[in-house]
Amino acid sequence: MSVTPPNVQFNLNGDSDHKSDNSSSSLENKLDTELKITSPPRNPPQRLHPVDFSEHADTDDDMNHPLPRVQSPVHIKNHIDPKLAEDRYRSSAARHFEPISIPPSAITSEDEDDYHGSANSSTVLPPRTENALHAASPKPSGSTGYTSPALSQNSGSGGEGESDEGSFNTQHHRSPIFQAYPSSEDLVGDPNDPYRRTRRAPIKTNPHDIPSQFIFRKLGLHHGKHGHHGHSGSLSLKSLVPNHHDKHDKHDKHEKHHSSLDLRRFFKSHQKTDKEKKPSVSKSKSSANLQDDHFGLFKKYGKFGRMLGSGAGGSVRIMKRSSDGKIFAVKEFRARRPTETEREYARKVTAEFCIGSALHHTNIIETLDIVEENKKFYEVMEYAPYDMFSIVMSGKMTMPEVYCCFKQLLSGVAYLHSMGLAHRDLKLDNLVVDSNCFVKIIDFGSAVVFKYPFEADIVEATGVVGSDPYLAPETLVRKLYDPRAVDIWSSAIIFCCMALRRFPWKYPKLSDNSFRLFCMKQPSNDAESPSDILADIKKQRLVEQGCEPIRKTDESHSPNSKTDNSSTHKQELYGPWRLLRLLPRETRAVIAHMLELDPVKRYDIHRVFADNWINDISMCHMENGKVIHSPTHVHNLVASEESPAPPAKH
C-alpha cells in the first residue's frame, strides 16, 4: 500500500513557510510563475510501507505524484537557462528527500509477503541456505532446525514452501538440509562436447605408442661423470641457467631423487637427513629406534596411544599432543604389497587423502594432514571417541535416537553425492560418534567419483568392495553399476541393524535363505510355485544365485513331517514384507524403496529426503557454529569397552 503525502507549493529558495516580500530578480519571478513545482512537506509523515511508484508513473496529475516534478521550460517565452533551472530544482528536491533503507535480514510482515509475492521483481535473491532458513522461520515446539524440505528432483525456488504464518510446513515442498551444497547434477555441461569422458580415446599404456614430444627423461638419468655429452640435442634447465658451482661429484647422483615424477614431494616428509646413523643391533633399543623413526610425527602430534581398530586398509591409533592435550586419530596405511610399485602405492594413498581432505561436513570425519616417514604414510584425522557398532549393540538406543542417527547418516551421504562422490563401503564399523552426538562417516578408501564437474555422464563403478551383509545385490552380478544406488542400499541395511540389532541376511545371494525369501514374491495364484518365482528372478539377473541349487535350499525349509502343513504355510512369508513387518510402521515405505532389487527403480537420495517420515525426524545438528540437540531424545554414548558381545544368531 503506497502513501502519497500532500503536496504544497514552494519557491525555488526552499522557504515553504513564508514568501519573501521583495523578489530578488525578474528571473526568479518568472520561474515562480511559469514553473509549477510540487514537493512534500518539510516533515512528512513516517512511511510504514514501501511506496510503489509504478502506479503513478504515467499519470499527468502532478498533485498525485509523490516526488517533485518540473514542467519543461520549452513553453517559456523568455530565455531561461535550462541547466540552471534543473540544478535549482534538484537542490530543492534533495532538501526534502528522506532515504528509506531496509536491512536485508529484516522479516517482512504477512501483508508485505502477499504483496511482494504477486509483484514482478527483477531482483535475483540469493539462494536460501540452511542457516538462513532457521534464522528466518519460527520453529514449532516439537521440531528441530531441520524443518527444511526434502529435496525433490524438480525442486524450485523457496516461495511455495512458506505458509501463511511465515513458517515452513513439513510436507514435500521443504528444501532438504543438503540443498545449500552445490550438486554435481547441476554442472551438466554440453552433451555434444567432443572432449567428454565417454568420447575420449582410451589411454595408451604402451610407451612405444606415446609421441616423442611427450616423452621426458629424468635429469642425470643417462649422464656420465663427464657431464651432458651423451645427448647433445636435448635441453635441460641446467644448460639454460649458468651454474658456477657445477661440479661432477656426488651431487649429480643426488639429483635423481628430486625428479618431477616423484609423488613423495606432495607429502610432508619428516625423515632424518643424518644418513650416518646405523640401525641398532641390540633388541633393548628397539623402542628408542621406533621413536626415532617417527620423530617428526611425534613432535607435531604427540605420541601413539591405544589401538582404535584395524582393517584391510591399515590400522588407526590415538595420538595425544602434549602442548594442548588435543587428541587425534592417526591411520597408518597398510604396507606396500610386493606386486605394487611405489608409484601405484603412493597413488592409492593420495587418492584417499585427497578425497577426505576435500570434504567438510558435520557428518563427515575431518581429514587434517598426511605424513610420510620411512616409506610409510600416516593420515591424521579428528578423533571421535565412540563407534556406532558399540552403541547399537549396547541395546540402549531408543527409536527416536535411531531415527536421528539415520538421518545424520543420510545427510552425510547426501553431501557426498552432491560432491559427485560415492562411499561404497557404508557400514556400522565406518560410523563414529563424537562428543556432540554427531554421526560421522569415515574410511574413504573405497570411495569413487561418479560424476565430474561439467560432465553429463555418470561414471559407473566396478569391483566388489565392502562387507557381505551390507553389499548391494547388483555388485555381485554386474561388472559396472551405479555407486549411488549402492550407498542407498547400504544405508537401509544400517537402519535395519540399528532398529533390529541384527543383520537381515549374511550376504545378498539366493543361497542365503533370508535373502532368498526376501527376493521372492507372494504367489499370484495357486498354480505359481516358489520355484517359478525364483526362476523369474534368475532371468532378471538382479541377484546372484550362489553355489547351492534352488531345490536343495527349498527342501531344507520344507515342512517337517511332525509339523502341521497349515501352520508352516502361515509362518512362511515371502517378499520384502518378511523384513518390513519387523520395522516401525512409518519407516516401511521408504525402507522398501531403498531396498529395491532393481537399482534403476531404487530411491536416490533426493527421493529419500522427499519422504514425510524423513522430513519429520528431529535431528541433532549444527547451526551457526552452535550445537543444537533435539528435544525429543537423549543419545546414549557407549564406548567400545562397555559394549556387550553380539547376540548369537538363531
Curated annotation (Swiss-Prot):
Gene3D superfamilies: Phosphorylase Kinase, domain 1, Transferase(Phosphotransferase) domain 1. Residues 222-231, 245-257 have a biased composition (Basic residues). Overexpression causes cell cycle arrest. It comes from Schizosaccharomyces pombe (strain 972 / ATCC 24843). It is found in: Cytoplasm. It holds the Pfam family Pkinase. This is Serine/threonine-protein kinase oca2. ATP binds at L308, G309, S310, G311, A312, G313, G314, S315, V316, K331. It catalyses: L-seryl-[protein] + ATP = O-phospho-L-seryl-[protein] + ADP + H(+); L-threonyl-[protein] + ATP = O-phospho-L-threonyl-[protein] + ADP + H(+). It comes from the Eukaryota. The active site is at D425. The keyword Phosphoprotein applies. PANTHER family: SERINE/THREONINE KINASE, SERINE_THREONINE-PROTEIN KINASE HRK1. SUPFAM superfamilies: Protein kinase-like (PK-like). The gene is oca2. GO terms for molecular function: ATP binding; protein serine kinase activity; protein serine/threonine kinase activity. Residues 1-14, 140-154 have a biased composition (Polar residues). Residues 78-98, 258-279 have a biased composition (Basic and acidic residues). Signal peptide: none annotated. Residues 1-210, 222-288, 549-570 are annotated as: Disordered. The keyword Nucleotide-binding applies. InterPro entries: Kinase-like_dom_sf, Prot_kinase_dom, Protein_kinase_ATP_BS, Ser/Thr_kinase_AS. Its EC number is 2.7.11.1. GO terms for biological process: negative regulation of transcription by RNA polymerase II; regulation of nitrogen utilization; signaling. The modification Phosphoserine is found at S72, S286. Belongs to the protein kinase superfamily. Ser/Thr protein kinase family. Residues 302-614 form the Protein kinase domain.
